[in-house]
């Protein structure tokens, strides 16, 4: 049933045409001088959800935009299920009927708690249900971040469990007999003794994109890596996606469901570390209010061309 639904959705026209070279995504409207991260595009390409985050992670909320006639997009709005607690990292199921995200909202009342994985479900009229905590064994007393769900129902996410391989790891809870199994850390082809986090798994679980920090081939701030899964279901040693990475943090990858577009978040900037001569207040204000001012932005690129360069 899921496969049929996904095939139908991918047959629909995709009007977003990704650039061959890495570029800011919708500069000035999605990527601005604020902190934007965590792109999630619906399977049919008609909706986008992403996170708007305050400085120093003081608050985060999920924004929503939908496609209008003429290949235009609506103005951003706070998603109907967000805006009260720290919400971030939206991720669609492959059938578009569920949207997972991470939140510190309480199970009841108004007192914030640790971060858990939550989900909203699509009603027949297109509206979203009230958020539901995914529950154990996915959620624990620790933090769970950055959900990514496969066609099988398997749920991948990030946490810092003591049972892990390193300081922060990528886990999977398999979906079996209508429920999740206990979380298992991916093996050392993906996880290491360092930090691995914010993974996107393809719907067929044939590849996984994630960020790692501190590896010998790291550009300095945390890099994007890719691991392929062989026919036996074994993850292969991850490779640094050096053509994308920068000295800043590059993370939060997402590939559109037709596998044409790669989105990710980066804090790279155009600000100089020195000036040839003393600058002015006006020049500083202009620079600090620019899009590439060191705030996080969403970037995009043609994923198929990128895959070809990785072979």
Question: Which ranges hold each PLM region?
Answer:
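Short, conserved micro-motifs composed of acidic
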Residues: 14-311
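Bacterial Sec-dependent N-terminal signal peptides
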Residues: 1-17
């Amino acid at each position: 049933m899921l496969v049929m639904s996904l095939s139908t959705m991918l047959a629909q026209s995709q009007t977003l045409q990704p650039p061959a070279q890495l570029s800011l995504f919708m500069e000035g409207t999605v990527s601005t001088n604020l902190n934007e991260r965590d792109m999630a595009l619906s399977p049919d390409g008609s909706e986008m959800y992403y996170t708007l985050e305050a400085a120093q992670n003081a608050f985060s909320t999920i924004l929503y935009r939908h496609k209008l006639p003429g290949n235009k997009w609506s103005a951003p709005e706070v998603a109907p299920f967000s805006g009260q607690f720290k919400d971030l990292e939206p991720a669609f199921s492959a059938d578009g009927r569920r949207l997972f995200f991470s939140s510190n909202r309480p199970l009841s009342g108004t007192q914030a708690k640790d971060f858990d994985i939550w989900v909203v479900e699509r009603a027949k009229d297109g509206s979203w249900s009230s958020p539901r905590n995914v529950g154990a064994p996915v959620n624990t007393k620790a933090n769970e971040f950055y959900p990514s769900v496969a066609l099988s129902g398997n749920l991948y996410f990030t946490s810092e469990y003591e049972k892990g391989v390193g300081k922060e790891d990528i886990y999977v809870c398999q979906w079996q007999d209508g429920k999740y199994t206990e979380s298992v850390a991916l093996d050392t082809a993906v996880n290491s003794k360092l930090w691995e986090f914010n993974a996107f798994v393809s719907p067929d679980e044939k590849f996984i994109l994630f960020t790692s920090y501190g590896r010998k081939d790291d550009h300095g701030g945390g890099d994007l890596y890719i691991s392929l899964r062989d026919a036996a279901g074994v993850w292969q040693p991850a490779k640094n996606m050096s053509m994308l990475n920068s000295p800043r943090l590059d993370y939060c990858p997402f590939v559109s469901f037709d596998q044409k577009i790669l989105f990710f978040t980066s804090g790279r900037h155009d600000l100089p570390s020195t000036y040839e001569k003393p600058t002015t207040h006006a020049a500083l204000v202009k620079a600090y209010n620019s899009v590439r001012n060191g705030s996080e932005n969403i970037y995009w690129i043609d994923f198929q061309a990128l895959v070809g360069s990785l072979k």
